[in-house]
Amino acid sequence: MATNAKPVYQRILLKLSGEALQGAEGFGIDASVLDRMAQEVKELVELGIQVGVVIGGGNLFRGAGLAQAGMNRVVGDHMGMLATVMNGLAMRDALHRAYVNARLMSAIPLNGVCDNYSWAEAISLLRHNRVVIFAAGTGNPFFTTDSAACLRGIEIEADVVLKATKVDGVYSADPVKNPDATLYEQLTYQDVLEQELKVMDLAAFTLARDHNLPIRVFNMNKPGALRRVVMGENEGTLIAK
């Protein structure tokens, strides 16, 4: 497909999983992956696209296992929120080193570390071409960072949520287990619900559907994929009404 002369989106919400930041490492943050992602975000800013970012925390902390071992779920989720703040600090630093203006906003107050989340301030920053990183999820336990991505996407009136993953999009089945699995180019919200496709948790997905917020799932590990998505190429899977 021919590349459009201009980006097809003006404002996006990029959802990065914590695992994406760990690269080949089993834990933590791979500095080279972080820097590559910062460069890809920089490309979007240079194209005039307004970028909001939500990052997960699974590379640093996973509450599910500890919850099974008896830890209170609320405590585990609070720890997970702090993990996303750590990832957000790392991403903000990588963007600053790439000469990109970026602000980190947290849904839980962490004075002296990052700004408190403010919807109006976030919109203002985006309009001035600042990258805004949203950390600490929704600020509430029992909600995933996918829910946070959809919530922030709706709040900032993003054109789309771009969910960066390790696979090329949404498949009819797990492509690792089933080599015959089909990659979908486009789906409706109803298709995803009826076929019980694994895109996001139900709370996050329903939020996006109810507010007609399109979701595009793509492989962030493919160099240039993010740019191709915003330029309107058929990269990954688009889920819309």
Swiss-Prot record:
Gene Ontology BP term (one): 'de novo' CTP biosynthetic process
Give yes or no: UniProt keyword Kinase. Answer: yes
What UniProt keywords apply to this chain's record, in alphabetical order?
A: Allosteric enzyme, ATP-binding, Cytoplasm, Kinase, Nucleotide-binding, Pyrimidine biosynthesis, Transferase
Q: Which Gene3D superfamilies match?
A: Acetylglutamate kinase-like
**Entry EC number(s):** 2.7.4.22
Task: Give me the reactions it catalyses.
Answer: UMP + ATP = UDP + ADP
Q: InterPro entries per the record?
A: AceGlu_kinase-like_sf, Asp/Glu/Uridylate_kinase, Uridylate_kinase, Uridylate_kinase_bac
The record's top EC class is transferase
* GO (cellular component) term, any one: cytosol
Quick one: where's region Involved in allosteric activation by GTP? 23-28
Asked if Cytoplasm is a keyword of the record, the answer is yes
The lineage's top-level taxon is Bacteria
Q: Give me the residues that bind ATP, please.
A: K15, L16, S17, G18, G58, R62, T165, Y171, D174
Q: Which CDD domains match?
A: AAK_UMPK-PyrH-Ec
Q: Where in the cell is it found?
A: Cytoplasm
The pathway is: Pyrimidine metabolism; CTP biosynthesis via de novo pathway; UDP from UMP (UMPK route): step 1/1
The entry assigns this protein to a family as follows: Belongs to the UMP kinase family.
Question: What role is this protein assigned?
Answer: Catalyzes the reversible phosphorylation of UMP to UDP.
Q: Which PANTHER family match?
A: URIDYLATE KINASE, URIDYLATE KINASE PUMPKIN, CHLOROPLASTIC
Tell me the subunit arrangement. Homohexamer.
Q: What is this protein called?
A: Uridylate kinase
